[in-house]
Amino acid sequence: FDCPILPMRYESAELCKISINMFLVSSVSTTNMLAEVCEAIGADWREIAPALRLDRRIGPHAYLTPGLGIGGGNLTRDLVSVQALASAHGTDAGIVDAWLSNSEHRRDWALRTLRAHGVERPGIVLGLWGLAYKEHTQFTKNSPAMALIAALPGVAVRAYDPAVADAETPGSVTRVASALAAARGADLLATMTPWPEFASVNAEEL
Protein backbone atom coordinates (compact mmCIF):
# COMPACT_ATOMS: atom_id res chain seq x y z
CA PHE A 1 0.00 0.00 0.00
CA ASP A 2 1.24 3.47 -0.87
CA CYS A 3 0.62 4.96 2.55
CA PRO A 4 2.55 5.53 5.79
CA ILE A 5 3.20 2.42 7.89
CA LEU A 6 3.38 3.05 11.63
CA PRO A 7 4.77 0.17 13.69
CA MET A 8 3.00 -0.16 17.06
CA ARG A 9 2.06 -2.76 19.62
CA TYR A 10 -1.20 -4.67 19.21
CA GLU A 11 -3.00 -2.76 21.97
CA SER A 12 -2.07 0.56 20.40
CA ALA A 13 -3.24 -0.57 16.97
CA GLU A 14 -6.63 -1.59 18.35
CA LEU A 15 -7.06 1.70 20.19
CA CYS A 16 -5.75 3.71 17.23
CA LYS A 17 -8.79 2.94 15.07
CA ILE A 18 -11.11 3.69 17.98
CA SER A 19 -9.22 6.95 18.61
CA ILE A 20 -9.79 8.12 15.03
CA ASN A 21 -13.50 7.53 15.46
CA MET A 22 -13.51 9.31 18.83
CA PHE A 23 -12.03 12.46 17.28
CA LEU A 24 -14.58 12.25 14.48
CA VAL A 25 -17.40 11.91 17.02
CA SER A 26 -16.10 14.91 18.95
CA SER A 27 -16.23 16.99 15.76
CA VAL A 28 -19.69 15.72 14.84
CA SER A 29 -21.06 16.34 18.33
CA THR A 30 -19.56 19.81 18.65
CA THR A 31 -20.86 20.76 15.21
CA ASN A 32 -24.37 19.53 16.01
CA MET A 33 -24.46 21.33 19.35
CA LEU A 34 -23.27 24.64 17.91
CA ALA A 35 -25.64 24.38 14.94
CA GLU A 36 -28.53 24.04 17.37
CA VAL A 37 -27.30 27.10 19.29
CA CYS A 38 -27.21 28.96 15.96
CA GLU A 39 -30.80 28.01 15.33
CA ALA A 40 -31.81 29.31 18.75
CA ILE A 41 -30.07 32.70 18.56
CA GLY A 42 -30.42 33.54 14.86
CA ALA A 43 -26.84 32.80 13.79
CA ASP A 44 -26.06 30.77 10.65
CA TRP A 45 -23.67 27.84 11.01
CA ARG A 46 -22.97 27.96 7.26
CA GLU A 47 -21.33 31.34 7.81
CA ILE A 48 -19.26 30.11 10.77
CA ALA A 49 -17.89 26.84 9.37
CA PRO A 50 -15.61 28.45 6.73
CA ALA A 51 -13.88 30.47 9.46
CA LEU A 52 -13.21 27.30 11.44
CA ARG A 53 -11.66 25.63 8.41
CA LEU A 54 -9.15 28.49 8.16
CA ASP A 55 -7.79 27.61 11.60
CA ARG A 56 -4.94 25.13 11.04
CA ARG A 57 -5.74 23.40 14.33
CA ILE A 58 -9.12 22.45 12.86
CA GLY A 59 -8.34 22.36 9.14
CA PRO A 60 -10.04 22.41 5.75
CA HIS A 61 -11.14 18.77 5.94
CA ALA A 62 -12.81 18.94 9.35
CA TYR A 63 -16.27 17.43 9.62
CA LEU A 64 -18.40 20.52 10.16
CA THR A 65 -21.71 19.55 8.60
CA PRO A 66 -24.59 19.42 11.13
CA GLY A 67 -26.67 16.27 11.19
CA LEU A 68 -29.09 14.16 13.19
CA GLY A 69 -26.72 12.51 15.63
CA ILE A 70 -24.31 9.62 15.14
CA GLY A 71 -25.69 7.13 12.64
CA GLY A 72 -24.53 3.75 11.45
CA GLY A 73 -22.91 1.09 13.58
CA ASN A 74 -19.16 1.72 13.72
CA LEU A 75 -19.00 4.97 15.66
CA THR A 76 -21.59 3.92 18.23
CA ARG A 77 -19.86 0.56 18.63
CA ASP A 78 -16.54 2.25 19.37
CA LEU A 79 -18.16 4.64 21.85
CA VAL A 80 -19.61 1.70 23.74
CA SER A 81 -16.21 -0.04 23.62
CA VAL A 82 -14.52 2.98 25.21
CA GLN A 83 -17.20 3.10 27.90
CA ALA A 84 -16.52 -0.56 28.68
CA LEU A 85 -12.75 -0.05 28.76
CA ALA A 86 -13.09 2.95 31.05
CA SER A 87 -15.39 1.06 33.39
CA ALA A 88 -13.09 -1.96 33.50
CA HIS A 89 -9.96 0.07 34.22
CA GLY A 90 -11.29 2.87 36.41
CA THR A 91 -10.84 5.76 33.98
CA ASP A 92 -13.27 8.60 33.30
CA ALA A 93 -15.24 8.39 30.04
CA GLY A 94 -17.86 10.95 30.98
CA ILE A 95 -17.29 12.79 27.72
CA VAL A 96 -18.36 9.64 25.84
CA ASP A 97 -21.57 9.56 27.87
CA ALA A 98 -22.15 13.18 26.84
CA TRP A 99 -21.56 12.39 23.16
CA LEU A 100 -24.08 9.55 23.24
CA SER A 101 -26.62 11.73 25.04
CA ASN A 102 -26.12 14.55 22.52
CA SER A 103 -26.48 12.10 19.65
CA GLU A 104 -29.83 10.91 20.94
CA HIS A 105 -30.96 14.51 21.43
CA ARG A 106 -29.97 15.46 17.88
CA ARG A 107 -31.51 12.30 16.41
CA ASP A 108 -34.87 13.39 17.83
CA TRP A 109 -34.64 16.97 16.50
CA ALA A 110 -36.90 16.13 13.57
CA LEU A 111 -39.44 14.48 15.89
CA ARG A 112 -39.56 17.54 18.15
CA THR A 113 -39.92 19.86 15.18
CA LEU A 114 -42.64 17.80 13.51
CA ARG A 115 -44.59 17.49 16.75
CA ALA A 116 -44.47 21.27 17.09
CA HIS A 117 -46.16 21.41 13.67
CA GLY A 118 -48.89 18.94 14.58
CA VAL A 119 -47.62 15.78 12.90
CA GLU A 120 -49.73 13.57 15.17
CA ARG A 121 -53.04 15.22 14.30
CA PRO A 122 -55.54 12.79 12.74
CA GLY A 123 -55.22 12.44 8.98
CA ILE A 124 -51.75 13.96 8.68
CA VAL A 125 -49.53 12.55 5.92
CA LEU A 126 -45.76 12.83 6.46
CA GLY A 127 -43.36 12.78 3.52
CA LEU A 128 -39.83 11.53 4.19
CA TRP A 129 -36.81 12.17 2.03
CA GLY A 130 -34.19 9.58 2.91
CA LEU A 131 -34.13 6.44 5.05
CA ALA A 132 -30.41 5.55 5.14
CA TYR A 133 -28.32 6.71 8.09
CA LYS A 134 -26.23 8.85 5.72
CA GLU A 135 -26.04 9.63 2.02
CA HIS A 136 -24.37 7.24 -0.44
CA THR A 137 -25.23 4.11 1.53
CA GLN A 138 -28.06 1.60 1.70
CA PHE A 139 -27.69 0.89 5.40
CA THR A 140 -30.29 1.97 7.96
CA LYS A 141 -28.69 0.93 11.26
CA ASN A 142 -29.15 3.78 13.78
CA SER A 143 -30.90 5.75 11.06
CA PRO A 144 -32.69 8.91 12.28
CA ALA A 145 -35.43 8.24 9.74
CA MET A 146 -36.12 4.77 11.13
CA ALA A 147 -36.18 6.16 14.68
CA LEU A 148 -38.63 8.84 13.55
CA ILE A 149 -40.93 6.27 11.93
CA ALA A 150 -40.88 4.15 15.10
CA ALA A 151 -41.78 7.19 17.22
CA LEU A 152 -44.82 8.02 15.05
CA PRO A 153 -46.68 4.70 14.72
CA GLY A 154 -50.04 6.30 13.97
CA VAL A 155 -48.84 8.65 11.24
CA ALA A 156 -49.19 7.87 7.53
CA VAL A 157 -45.68 8.05 6.02
CA ARG A 158 -44.67 8.26 2.35
CA ALA A 159 -40.92 7.74 1.96
CA TYR A 160 -38.34 7.92 -0.80
CA ASP A 161 -34.72 6.79 -0.66
CA PRO A 162 -32.65 6.07 -3.78
CA ALA A 163 -30.63 3.24 -2.21
CA VAL A 164 -32.48 1.57 0.67
CA ALA A 165 -34.29 -1.64 -0.28
CA ASP A 166 -38.04 -1.86 0.24
CA ALA A 167 -37.47 -4.86 2.52
CA GLU A 168 -35.67 -2.59 5.00
CA THR A 169 -38.74 -0.39 5.42
CA PRO A 170 -41.44 -0.98 8.07
CA GLY A 171 -44.68 -2.26 6.59
CA SER A 172 -46.55 0.83 7.76
CA VAL A 173 -44.53 3.03 5.40
CA THR A 174 -45.53 3.61 1.78
CA ARG A 175 -42.45 3.61 -0.47
CA VAL A 176 -42.57 5.82 -3.55
CA ALA A 177 -40.34 6.17 -6.60
CA SER A 178 -39.17 9.78 -6.33
CA ALA A 179 -38.67 12.70 -4.00
CA LEU A 180 -41.55 14.58 -5.59
CA ALA A 181 -43.83 11.56 -5.16
CA ALA A 182 -43.02 11.53 -1.44
CA ALA A 183 -43.87 15.22 -1.19
CA ARG A 184 -47.04 14.98 -3.25
CA GLY A 185 -50.07 15.07 -0.95
CA ALA A 186 -47.94 15.34 2.20
CA ASP A 187 -48.92 17.78 4.93
CA LEU A 188 -45.37 17.84 6.29
CA LEU A 189 -42.05 16.96 4.64
CA ALA A 190 -38.82 16.01 6.41
CA THR A 191 -35.39 15.53 4.84
CA MET A 192 -33.80 12.77 6.93
CA THR A 193 -30.84 11.84 4.71
CA PRO A 194 -28.93 14.56 2.82
CA TRP A 195 -28.89 12.89 -0.59
CA PRO A 196 -27.58 15.43 -3.16
CA GLU A 197 -30.65 15.05 -5.37
CA PHE A 198 -32.85 16.56 -2.67
CA ALA A 199 -30.93 19.84 -2.81
CA SER A 200 -31.72 20.17 -6.51
CA VAL A 201 -35.50 19.93 -6.11
CA ASN A 202 -37.14 23.22 -7.03
CA ALA A 203 -39.40 24.47 -4.25
CA GLU A 204 -41.99 25.47 -6.85
CA GLU A 205 -42.35 21.79 -7.80
CA LEU A 206 -43.49 20.81 -4.32
PLM regions and their residue ranges:
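Structural/interface elements that position substrates and couple domains in central-metabolism enzymes
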Residues: 1-206
